[in-house]
Amino acid sequence: MIQHLALDALQRHLAGSPLYAWATSLPAQIAARIEEGHGDLARWWSAVQRLPQVQAPTVELAGRFALHSERDAALQPQVKEALQGLIPWRKGPFDFFGVQVDTEWRSDWKWSRVSPHVDLRGKRILDVGCGNGYYQWRMLGAGAESVIGIDPNWLFLCQFLAAKRYLADLPAWHLPLALEDLPEKLEGFDTLFSMGVLYHRRSPIDHLLALKDCLKRGGELVLETLVVEGDASTVLVPEDRYAQMRNVWFLPSVAALELWLRRAGFADARCVDVSLTSVEEQRATEWMRFQSLPEFLDPQDRSRTVEGLPAPMRATLVARKP
C-alpha cells in the first residue's frame, strides 16, 4: 500500500527545500503506522483496488471535483460499487465518471466562502486534518503549487487514494499522520489550512503554536472553527457533548479567537466569514447514512443543539506569521 502514497515523488518534489529532510523520514514513519494497521483497512483498500484502471481525460478541480471519460456510462456500475465500499463519505461532493457521491457535507459551500479570501497561486500548502482530501483537490484547482494533507484516519486516506488513482501526476499527497507526528519547526509551508480541527483540541493555543511552527516567515494561516457570539472574554466550554460530539472542548467568540491568534504570535488576524451551519449543508445521504445535523438540533428550536447550546456557527479567520 505504501507505494501508492507516492512518497518518492514527494521527496523529489521537496528536494532542495526546508522540507526535504522531513520527506526522507516519511517512508519509515508511515510504514510503522501501516504495520499498526486498522481492522477495516484491508476492506477499504480492496474497495480502492476495485475501481477501474482507466484514464480520466477530463478533470475539473476549479469549480467542482469531477472526472470524466468517453466511457462514463460503461464505467459507472463498477465505480459506484467500489466507492460504496468506502461509505461513509463525509466531505465532498465528488463526481467520478458520472457517479455522484453526495457526501454528508456540502464542502463546496464552505470552499466558496473561504477561497475568495486567499491567493493560493504557486503556494506550497499543508492541510491539517484534511479528511478525504476534497479541499486538497480544490486547492490545486485554485492554483496551488502542491498540497500535503495530514489526517490519521485510514478511511479518509483510502477515499483520497480513490481520487488519486485517476490523478496520480498531480502534486497532492495524503499522509496518515497527526499534527503531533510532524517534526518541530518545519517552517516550510506558504499556506496552512486548519478547518474543523481547533474545537477538537484540548489545548487550542498549543495547536495554534504548532501550526505557526509549520509556516515559513510571512506564511498565511487559514483557520476555520466553531464559534459563539460574544466579546473577547467569551468562550463556551461544553459540560459534556456538543451537537452529540464528545470531543468538543472550546468554542470561542470571533474576538476571543483573534486574541488567541495574537497571543500565539500571529499578526494581521482578520475574520473573513461567519456562517450558521444549515441542515442543507450537513445532512445524512445515501453515501453517509448515520445521524447528522438535523438530528443534533433541538426539533423545537433549531437555534439550539439537543443539549440546549447555541447551534453550530463557523468562522474563518486568516492570519500571518510575522
From Swiss-Prot:
Homotetramer. The gene is cmoB. Catalyzes carboxymethyl transfer from carboxy-S-adenosyl-L-methionine (Cx-SAM) to 5-hydroxyuridine (ho5U) to form 5-carboxymethoxyuridine (cmo5U) at position 34 in tRNAs. PANTHER family: METHYLTRANSFERASE, TRNA U34 CARBOXYMETHYLTRANSFERASE. Carboxy-S-adenosyl-L-methionine binds at K91, W105, K110, G129, L179, E180, M195, Y199, R314. It catalyses: carboxy-S-adenosyl-L-methionine + 5-hydroxyuridine(34) in tRNA = 5-carboxymethoxyuridine(34) in tRNA + S-adenosyl-L-homocysteine + H(+). One of its GO terms (molecular function) is transferase activity, transferring alkyl or aryl (other than methyl) groups. The lineage of its organism: Bacteria, Pseudomonadati, Pseudomonadota, Gammaproteobacteria, Pseudomonadales. This is tRNA U34 carboxymethyltransferase. Keywords: Transferase, tRNA processing. InterPro entries: CmoB, Mo5U34_MeTrfas-like, SAM-dependent_MTases_sf. Belongs to the class I-like SAM-binding methyltransferase superfamily. CmoB family. HAMAP family: tRNA_carboxymethyltr_CmoB. Its EC number is 2.5.1.-. GO terms for biological process: tRNA wobble uridine modification.
